[in-house]
């Protein structure tokens, strides 16, 4: 999965997919009442990027739905996975469940079109704080209450705070999650970060009894870093330059080892070599 980083304006969806991304990451900010409000990152953000692009969250969802609904004039068949980077740092811990409920209602209405031929992309809810694990239950309970438990087949989870792998496992246990787990590891492109924790996450994924299904590394903009990440066995790389990742994947060392994921590749099933 080549994951386009910080895709917060609707026009950027096409821009990143046309550069080679089959997945995008979108920031979601919340208002004081835990309503998802804008697709917005703000300052500071990655080096070389504008931090200030934004849409109203519901408008972005409608644009995303168009891009991921077969038959729509804006349809992009390659776009199969969307990571919502939930900026829950602005919320009190006791608002996490409420944020999950509201997120579920927004997605159900504006993205899934109330279960009637909505967008088809898989969704990952990425949460920066382990203490906000109740967001997951708020989300899953709401989809069930609204009569659409089947949509949970399209939803996965990520804790993005670079916490110890054992602590992340405990948070999932509390949230009642087993399966559909992506594990991110990374840092802004302005700084360097080694692959120690990525390798630990990959080992958990491949152990047969770990909690992780897929591992992605962010933010990868350089060819050398891309090679290191691919060598470490990641499933996804998040990048500001999808074309760079695509180029590396076409190099002799990689073109017979890795390929771009398609809609038929489940993002929840651990790939067995």
Swiss-Prot record:
Tissues in which the protein is found: Expressed by the venom gland.
EC number(s) on file: 4.6.1.-
Domain of life: Eukaryota
Disulphide linkage map: 45-51, 47-190
Residues given in the record as Mg(2+) binding sites: 25, 27, 85
Cofactors: Mg(2+)
Keyword Lyase: yes
Matching InterPro entries: PLC-like_Pdiesterase_TIM-brl
Catalytic reactions of this protein: an N-(acyl)-sphingosylphosphocholine = an N-(acyl)-sphingosyl-1,3-cyclic phosphate + choline; an N-(acyl)-sphingosylphosphoethanolamine = an N-(acyl)-sphingosyl-1,3-cyclic phosphate + ethanolamine; a 1-acyl-sn-glycero-3-phosphocholine = a 1-acyl-sn-glycero-2,3-cyclic phosphate + choline; a 1-acyl-sn-glycero-3-phosphoethanolamine = a 1-acyl-sn-glycero-2,3-cyclic phosphate + ethanolamine
GO cellular component, one term: extracellular region
GO biological process, one term: lipid catabolic process
KW Cell cycle (keyword) present: no
Record-level Gene Ontology MF annotations: lyase activity; metal ion binding; phosphoric diester hydrolase activity; toxin activity
Active site: 5, 41 (nucleophile)
Cofactor note: Binds 1 Mg(2+) ion per subunit.
Localization terms from the record: Secreted
Keywords on record: Cytolysis, Dermonecrotic toxin, Disulfide bond, Hemolysis, Lipid degradation, Lipid metabolism, Lyase, Magnesium, Metal-binding, Secreted, Toxin
Record-stated family: Belongs to the arthropod phospholipase D family. Class II subfamily.
Entry function: Dermonecrotic toxins cleave the phosphodiester linkage between the phosphate and headgroup of certain phospholipids (sphingolipid and lysolipid substrates), forming an alcohol (often choline) and a cyclic phosphate. This toxin acts on sphingomyelin (SM). It may also act on ceramide phosphoethanolamine (CPE), lysophosphatidylcholine (LPC) and lysophosphatidylethanolamine (LPE), but not on lysophosphatidylserine (LPS), and lysophosphatidylglycerol (LPG). It acts by transphosphatidylation, releasing exclusively cyclic phosphate products as second products.
Protein name according to UniProt: Dermonecrotic toxin LhSicTox-alphaIA2ai
């Amino acid at each position: 999965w080549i994951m386009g980083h910080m895709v917060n304006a609707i026009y950027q969806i096409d821009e990143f997919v046309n550069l080679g991304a089959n997945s995008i990451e979108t920031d979601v900010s919340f208002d004081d009442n835990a309503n998802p409000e804008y697709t917005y990152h703000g300052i500071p953000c990655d080096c070389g990027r504008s931090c200030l692009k934004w849409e109203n969250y519901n408008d972005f969802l409608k644009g995303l739905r168009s891009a991921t609904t077969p038959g729509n004039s804006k349809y992009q068949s390659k776009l199969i996975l969307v990571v919502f980077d939930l900026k829950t740092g602005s919320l009190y811990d006791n608002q996490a469940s409420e944020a999950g409920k509201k997120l579920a209602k927004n997605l159900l209405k504006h993205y899934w079109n109330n279960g009637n031929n909505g967008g088809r992309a898989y969704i990952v809810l990425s949460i920066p704080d382990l203490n906000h694990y109740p967001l997951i239950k708020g989300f899953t309970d709401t989809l069930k209450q609204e009569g659409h438990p089947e949509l949970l087949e399209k939803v996965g989870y990520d804790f993005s705070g670079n916490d110890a792998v054992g602590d992340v496992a405990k948070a999932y246990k509390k949230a009642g999650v087993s399966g559909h787990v992506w594990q991110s590891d990374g840092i802004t492109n302005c700084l360097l970060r080694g692959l120690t924790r990525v390798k630990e996450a990959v080992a958990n994924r491949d152990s047969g009894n770990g909690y992780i299904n897929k591992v992605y590394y962010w933010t990868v903009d350089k060819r050398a870093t891309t090679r290191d990440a691919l060598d470490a066995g990641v499933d996804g790389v998040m990048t500001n330059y999808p074309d760079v990742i695509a180029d590396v994947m076409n190099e002799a060392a990689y073109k017979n080892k890795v390929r771009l994921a398609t809609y038929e590749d489940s993002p929840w099933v651990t790939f067995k070599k």
